[in-house]
Amino acid sequence: MKIFVINPGSTSTKIALFIDEKPVWAAGAHHTADDLSEFHHVNEQYAYRKDFVLRLLAEADIPLDFDAVIARGGLLKPTPGGVYAINEQMKHDLLNARMEHACNLGALIADEIARECHCPAYIADPEVVDELQPAARLTGIPEIERISIFHALNSKAVSRKYAASIGKHYEELNLIVVHLGGGISVGAHCKGRVIDVNNALNGEGPFSPERAGTIPADQLAELCFSGKYTLKQIKKMLNGKGGLTAHLGMNDVVTIARKASEGEEPYKGVLDAMLYTVAKQAGAMYVTLRGQVDAIILTGGIAHSDYCVGILKEQIDYLAPVVLMPGEDEMGSLAYNALGALKGELPLQVYRPE
């Protein structure tokens, strides 16, 4: 089956054609600041991005005769995971989303191209997947509720692939999935639902190459009211200039891991501390799953690092078997989900937020 995949990022647009799960063509480009300067809001980029996609297809002589079109999910209202048919409610919510991001355009472009092809249009496992159990939402401050923001697409895709590799369904397994990238998310996957996971974007859980993770609340409050920093600067400390970047002045884990493996400080101490926070979070998810864990999956770019994987395994491999599935293949994950929906192997969800 011919599956067309669209993945708009803040400064790039990537597209690919798959025959079943095999990529047969890919293209894309980085959009410069000049390219996007005329657009004051992301929604205004719709025609520009759509025409860009159609031009690349025309230049490659690829006709619009796909069996399905699937796009990266946007910043919708919280919704359970799965493959969703693009509907009018979804398009309305993307056009009126609280947060602007180019990923909101993916489903809109996919829907229009799919209409020309007379084929279904999907999204799968957007970043806003929310399957938290009730106890995981509450905090000690009633005005603050925990929210689910994590690497849903990759985490669920590797979970399904692992399940298939052992002759099981994702919905039969309990898994801890550790996504190791610029942000780090550690989720408890209970029979196909992520019932607890740290907010990998906004200051919760392990610290990461660019993010601060959980910070002692009293000290953070004092920092906020010290008069030294603006709200924007504090938020940048939490996401963008936190973690390894704050300690070491770099986010290049390949370089940091090489120095750490040679015993060079402060690289070894800081990287080992980051991995310690990851292991602690995995331990917390072990408790969430009441010790009934079939496997711990390590995925994301940092899972390519022998040093990081080795340190983590020393701390968590007594909990459950550790499975290595490094990297992050968003395009392949989207194609995998579309194929599953076309074959009837993955149930098609209807977007109806509460």
Curated annotation (Swiss-Prot):
Checking SUPFAM superfamilies in the record gives:
Actin-like ATPase domain
The cross-references to InterPro entries, in alphabetical order and at most eight, read: Aliphatic_acid_kin_short-chain, Aliphatic_acid_kinase_CS, ATPase_NBD, Butyrate_kin
**Cellular component, GO annotation:** cytoplasm
Task: Kindly state which keywords UniProt assigns to this record, in alphabetical order.
Answer: ATP-binding, Cytoplasm, Kinase, Nucleotide-binding, Transferase
Protein name as annotated: Probable butyrate kinase
Q: Where in the cell is it found?
A: Cytoplasm
Question: Which class of enzymes does this protein belong to?
Answer: transferase
Please state the Enzyme Commission number of this protein.
2.7.2.7
Species per Swiss-Prot/TrEMBL record: Phocaeicola vulgatus (strain ATCC 8482 / DSM 1447 / JCM 5826 / CCUG 4940 / NBRC 14291 / NCTC 11154)
A GO MF label: ATP binding
CDD domains, per the entry: ASKHA_NBD_BK
The processes (GO biological process) annotated in the record are: acetate metabolic process
The gene name on file is buk
Q: Which Pfam families match?
A: Acetate_kinase
